[in-house]
Amino acid sequence: MTDHKPSKSLPKATAKRLPQYYRLFKSLVEENVTRTNSQLISEKIGVDAATIRRDFSLFGELGRRGYGYETKVLRDFFGELLGQDQETHIALIGVGNLGRALLHYQFQDRNKMRITQAYDISGNPLVGTQTDDGIPIYNISDLEKNVKKSDIKTAILSVRKENAQEVVDTLVKAGIKGFLNFAPIRLKVPSDVVVQSIDLTKELQTLLFFMGAQEE
């Protein structure tokens, strides 16, 4: 199989499907399925077979015509692409309702990816405490100092949109290179920093639109 690392030119739609592919091949290996094909993959994850083959072609020869794909090989391949074996520490900014839920979220496919620090304003009674599994919740005034002393390069933002950019600016100065952003605002960051935004309101509105279209 060709050894091929993803480049910055990898289509975003393809990149978003990588975790699906990894999760599927991981599950198939656990079910003792040794080989599969694009049609069966399509049925499992709801992506058409042509798209799957096109995605896979971006990485070289992942399978053989008439033979299909070896599940263990592709589990390991996509796992490596996604950094499954790397220890990833994350800072959570904002411990409101959503933030508290995220603190207790189990990253099922990546047990080496975990939140190790959380932050909020001094008015939050949780500041100065820690979760049951030992995650400290700091005052946001300590954010830059603490992150600089840590190995954290990734942050989750669960703050009000009017505060989000200021928090991001502070974290970029502290060395953060990637953000998962739940604030409904477009963040300005340097070219070497990655932002993945999730707008829950927009996602729900899109869902309702498609539900309405189904009823017509």
UniProtKB/Swiss-Prot annotation:
Report the record's disulfide bonds.
Answer: none
Annotated DNA-binding ranges come to 20-59
State the UniProt keywords alphabetically: Cytoplasm, DNA-binding, NAD, Repressor, Transcription, Transcription regulation
GO biological processes: negative regulation of DNA-templated transcription; response to redox state
Cross-referenced InterPro entries:
CoA-bd, NAD(P)-bd_dom_sf, Rex_DNA-bd_C_dom, Tscrpt_rep_Rex, WH-like_DNA-bd_sf, WH_DNA-bd_sf
UniProt keyword Transmembrane, yes or no: no
Protein's cellular compartments: Cytoplasm
Supply the SMART domains for this chain: CoA_binding (SM00881)
Binding positions for NAD(+) per the UniProt entry: G94, V95, G96, N97, L98, G99
Q: Which Pfam families match?
A: CoA_binding, Put_DNA-bind_N
GO CC terms on record?
cytoplasm
Name the Gene Ontology molecular function terms of this record. DNA binding; DNA-binding transcription factor activity
Member of which family? Belongs to the transcriptional regulatory Rex family.
Question: Which HAMAP family does the annotation name?
Answer: Rex
Q: How does it assemble?
A: Homodimer.
Q: What does this protein do?
A: Modulates transcription in response to changes in cellular NADH/NAD(+) redox state.
Q: What is this protein called?
A: Redox-sensing transcriptional repressor Rex
State the organism named in the record: Lactococcus lactis subsp. cremoris (strain MG1363)
